[in-house]
């Protein structure tokens, strides 16, 4: 069974955009990302499935990108809620992101040429996009 077939059989792949992705995954040539909003200072059991998938793909030679949502966490996400998520300060978000990184390093190899960790605050805050979204009315 190939890696892709295993992931599909376990229900970890719902769809793909191109069949070339199958070969990339099976041959350890895929670069992929999974996003994490840092609304708390600790990863949860819900994050564990994503980390397990990242680890499994990395062990097969693929390159994971852990995308920390430092910028998007500043906005909040009321999806499926009747109230807004508590707004966190930049300092709280930076602290949570640092905690996530320390915890993720137990599972994912962030060494040279391995996994990458990015924080979308690094580019979103420079665009002042966060300010626009923060001051825009909620639907």
Label each region the model flagged.
Residues 3, 93-96, 128:
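General structural feature for long, well-ordered alpha-helical segments within catalytic domains
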Residues 21-78:
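N-terminal catalytic cores of NTP/NDP-binding nucleotidyl/phosphoryl-transfer enzymes
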Residues 1-30:
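Positively charged, low-complexity intrinsically disordered leader regions
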Residues 76-80, 127-132:
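Short acidic, glycine/serine/threonine-rich loops at helix termini
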Residues 134-139:
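Conserved small/polar residues in nucleotide/adenosyl-binding loops
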Residues 105-126:
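Conserved alpha/beta enzyme-core scaffolds, especially Rossmann-like or related mixed alpha/beta domains
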Residues 81-87:
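Short glycine-enriched, charge-decorated loop/helix-capping segments at active-site entrances
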Residues 88-110:
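A glycine-rich helix N-cap at a beta->alpha junction
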């Amino acid at each position: 069974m190939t890696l892709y077939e295993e992931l599909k059989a376990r229900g970890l792949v719902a769809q793909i955009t191109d069949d070339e992705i199958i070969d990339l995954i099976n041959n350890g040539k895929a670069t992929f990302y999974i996003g994490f909003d840092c609304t708390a200072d600790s990863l949860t059991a819900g994050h564990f499935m994503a980390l397990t998938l990242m680890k499994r793909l990395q062990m097969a030679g693929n390159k994971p990108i852990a995308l920390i949502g430092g910028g998007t966490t500043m906005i909040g996400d009321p999806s499926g809620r009747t109230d807004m998520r508590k707004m966190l300060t930049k300092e709280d978000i930076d602290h949570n992101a640092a905690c996530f990184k320390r915890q993720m390093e137990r599972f994912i190899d962030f060494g040279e040429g391995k996994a990458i960790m990015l924080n979308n605050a690094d580019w979103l805050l420079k665009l002042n996009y966060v300010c626009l979204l923060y001051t825009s009315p909620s639907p």
